[in-house]
UniProtKB/Swiss-Prot annotation:
It is an enzyme of class 2 (transferase). This is Glucose-1-phosphate thymidylyltransferase. The gene is rmlA. Its EC number is 2.7.7.24. Mg(2+) binds at residues 111, 226. It comes from Xanthomonas campestris pv. campestris (strain ATCC 33913 / DSM 3586 / NCPPB 528 / LMG 568 / P 25).
């Protein structure tokens, strides 16, 4: 099992999704048949990460705790911390400094969805890299809208640029980051950007300047979905529905991942399914317990 810690940043005000998010965190909204938070949580679990910190807003923490508990039902350990105000993605490493404790970590944004057949292997490659940082690049047609990474044939990042007018790469940097134990120290030394935030790009640039920033490309066959707008939330739900209906297999199901990882057994899986048997999700878990995991 990896010693890497996991952080899900699920704070923010979700203003782009108003009025839907005026009364509830966007990470608790449904993406087809599961809460949005299940998707980044599943990425950490696929990477073998079992110690997880969820950072959210003060008035929503009880809702996350009610939904996820301490994670024991999935064989993981979930803790919680508050982001008092949305002061940048890199702030996660100040809030989570004691939790990380100088160990390697993975940060995933709470509104990002990743899916693809080789994702687990890609995550394991990043986890095996003990020194430096790894970002994940996704080919896009409009790189000028994103933070973009230029990298060599060995995956070493040469340059990163935020929404460049003339992009030198089509690979956008996604909301998934693997760091070694220096991330909190680097974050503590950052200065707020002109918009008053501790930028994740500046944290990544610390590793770039040290010659320790790597990129794992997510090429053909991968999906990276940002659910931060009404349209993208709708598209993500349609995508998940299509995949699941075609194959009859769940996408980003924590119970299934825990079962496949050997963190829970068939009996525990059936107990998790019991309260859900009135819907297809519960029936899926029951069938999974009987047939075994599908790889």
């Amino acid at each position: 099992m990896t010693q890497r810690k996991g952080i899900i940043l699920a704070g923010g005000s979700g203003t782009r999704l108003y009025p839907i998010t005026k009364g509830v965190s966007k990470q608790l909204l449904p993406v087809y048949d599961k809460p949005m938070i299940y998707y980044p949580l599943s990425v950490l679990m696929l990477a073998g990460i079992r110690d997880i910190l969820i950072i959210n807003t003060p008035h929503e923490q009880a809702l996350f705790q009610s939904l996820l508990g301490d994670g024991a039902q999935w064989g993981v350990n979930i803790q919680y911390a508050v982001q008092p105000s949305p002061d940048g993605l890199a702030q996660a490493y100040l809030i989570g400094r004691d939790f990380v404790g100088g160990k390697p970590s993975c940060l995933v944004l709470g509104d990002n969805i990743f899916h693809g057949h080789g994702l687990t292997d890609t995550l394991r490659r990043a986890d095996a890299r003990e020194q430096g940082a790894t970002v994940f690049g996704y080919w896009v047609n409009d790189p000028e809208r994103y933070g973009v990474a230029e990298f060599d044939q060995h995956g070493k990042v040469i340059d990163i640029a935020e929404k460049p007018e003339k992009p030198r790469s089509n690979y956008a940097v996604t909301g998934l980051y693997f760091y070694d134990g220096k991330a909190s120290d680097y974050a503590a030394a950052l200065k707020p950007s002109p918009r008053g935030e501790l930028e994740i790009t500046d944290l990544n640039r610390c590793y770039l300047d040290a010659g320790d920033l790597h990129l794992e490309p997510l090429g053909r066959g991968y999906a990276w979905l940002d659910t931060g707008t009404h349209q993208s939330l709708h598209e993500a739900a349609n995508f998940i529905e299509t995949i699941q209906m075609r194959q009859g297999l769940q996408v980003c199901c924590p119970e299934e991942i825990a079962f496949g990882q050997g963190w829970i057994d068939a009996e525990q899986l059936e107990r998790l399914a019991a309260p859900l048997l009135k819907n297809d999700y519960g029936k899926y878990l029951t069938a999974l317990a009987k047939r075994g995991a599908v790889h």
